[in-house]
């Protein structure tokens, strides 16, 4: 899980849950969001598919209205008709939301590097900051640099699949995925798990 506030990642956490412990994970994420007055973005495919229903139930039980939104990695890109680069729209460049989101974070990291190292002017909405108090920073860096950029059958940018990563002996980048989600829907203080 990654807790962000604006451009700043303020907490990175990881826990492992077996399939029969998913409800406990939903509660843990919900409690972190409640404590931080934050919203939740969650992976809504595969194991995470049940999270939306769980958060709705927890809202009903608690009387609190925590906002939550599913992240469909294989879904359509955001702003499909906007231009990623001159002459190339998002829908003509990225295979899916996952590839668009990973590229967005890579672009923000490059912008941050240029601002810090080369003292270039920057738009605050286009950079990333990670609190030095965050646990798992080293793991995050490893995971962000693990998947390869790939080209889909349609000739669009995509992120290497987890199955292909597994063939290379690389585990699923769970912390990086949470980090990527946190910067996809991030407009204010937000918790993304």
Predicted regions and their residues:
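Acidic, Mg2+-coordinating catalytic module of metal-dependent nucleases/exonucleases
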Residues: 162-188
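Mg2+-dependent endonuclease catalytic cores in nucleic-acid-processing enzymes, primarily RNase H-like
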Residues: 2-156, 190-191
């Amino acid at each position: 899980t990654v807790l962000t506030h604006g451009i700043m990642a303020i907490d990175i956490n990881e826990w492992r849950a077996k399939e029969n412990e998913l409800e406990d994970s939903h509660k843990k994420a919900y409690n972190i969001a409640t404590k931080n007055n934050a919203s939740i973005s969650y992976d809504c495919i595969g194991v995470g598919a049940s999270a939306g229903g769980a958060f709705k139930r927890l809202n009903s039980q608690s009387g609190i209205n925590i906002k939550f939104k599913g992240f469909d990695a294989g879904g359509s890109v955001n702003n499909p008709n906007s231009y990623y680069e001159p002459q190339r729209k998002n829908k003509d460049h990225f295979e899916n939301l996952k590839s668009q989101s990973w590229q967005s974070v890579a672009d923000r990291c490059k912008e941050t590097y240029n601002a810090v190292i080369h003292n270039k002017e920057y738009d605050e909405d286009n950079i990333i900051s990670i609190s030095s108090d965050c646990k798992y920073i080293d793991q995050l860096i490893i995971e962000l640099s693990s998947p390869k950029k790939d080209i889909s059958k349609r000739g669009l940018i995509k992120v290497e699949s987890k199955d292909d990563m597994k063939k290379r002996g690389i585990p699923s980048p769970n912390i990086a995925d949470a980090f990527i989600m946190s910067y996809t829907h991030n407009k204010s203080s937000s918790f993304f798990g």
